[in-house]
Amino acid sequence: ELEITDAIQDLIDHGLTVNPHIVAGWWKDTGKLEDLLEANRLILETFTEQIEGDVDEKSSIEGKVVIEPGAIIRNSVVRGPAVIGNKARIEQAYIGPFTAIMNDVQIQGSEIEHSIVLEGAVITDVASRIVDSLIGKNVRIYRQPMKPSAYRFMLGDNSEVGIRW
């Protein structure tokens, strides 16, 4: 994990000039998941409703929700503040408050809230609600019926998984 001081030092090491500036407004160090989710919450709270995607009559949009052009919402509930990115597809799903769904994400038969889902991720038929999570680019999360019941993981270095029952 790199910190902002590492980036500043790298600029100096490459002979570039680094100058200080006072930042107006809030500042959040997003080096930890909790801080990243808090920054996401603060940003989403500033949004106003903007529905430009395709939402069917079986879906419910509540609160400050941004649905970008090309997004498709089918038989789902989206409760804001939330953003659904371009070309995202949400089907038979619940998208709860403080959730940012980026471009080209697919969520089907699953529930998620207070989370960030990056580009190209696919979440399919997850049995429990996903909360307080950061889902990386092109990640696939799906339920795979296996007997006996089991969890199967492929996790990168320094990963963390919390399982409740």
How would you name each of these model-derived features?
Residues 1-165:
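Left-handed beta-helix
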